[in-house]
């Protein structure tokens, strides 16, 4: 898309983990990280989760495609569970500041995913 329309801003939207809430699963955060890194390395300027907060069933939802979210609320108790995907998103948000520009980054291992950006203040 970037090659065809380099003047357009690309956003990844509606990221989520399907099939329930996945409480305690590190796989969800790892999946988010791989997706965010791959998208940033391919001209995406932003990454947006579909739902930041859902209830303990992965809803509410009108079509029964229940999902996980970075924050899960137990409605009866009012308890909020912070899933690892919340912390993964927070990690990227902390280091990739508004106005940052992605810079070339490479690894020598196929199982190591990486991205890098130059922030407006000069930090990497």
Cite the ranges covered by each PLM segment.
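Membrane-embedded translocation segments of transport machinery
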Residues: 1-8, 18
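Generic recognition of flexible, low-complexity loop/linker segments
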Residues: 1, 34-37, 112-116
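Carbohydrate-binding surface patches
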Residues: 94, 105-124
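Aromatic/acidic polysaccharide-binding cleft in carbohydrate-active enzymes
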Residues: 12-91, 103-107
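Substrate-binding/catalytic groove segments of enzymes
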Residues: 97-103
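Loop/turn elements at helix/coil->beta-strand transitions in domains of secreted/extracellular proteins
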Residues: 5-10, 42-47, 98, 121-124
């Amino acid at each position: 898309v970037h090659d065809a329309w380099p003047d357009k801003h690309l956003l990844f939207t509606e990221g989520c983990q399907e099939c329930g809430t996945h409480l305690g699963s590190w796989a969800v955060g790892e999946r988010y990280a791989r997706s965010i890194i791959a998208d940033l390395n391919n001209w995406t300027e932003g990454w947006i989760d579909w739902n930041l907060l859902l209830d303990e069933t992965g809803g509410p939802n009108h079509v029964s495609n229940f999902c996980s979210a970075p924050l899960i609320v137990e409605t009866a108790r009012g308890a909020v569970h912070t899933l690892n995907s919340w912390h993964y998103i927070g990690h990227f948000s902390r280091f990739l500041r508004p106005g940052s520009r992605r810079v070339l980054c490479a690894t020598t291992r196929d199982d190591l995913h990486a991205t890098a950006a130059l922030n407006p203040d000069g930090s990497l």
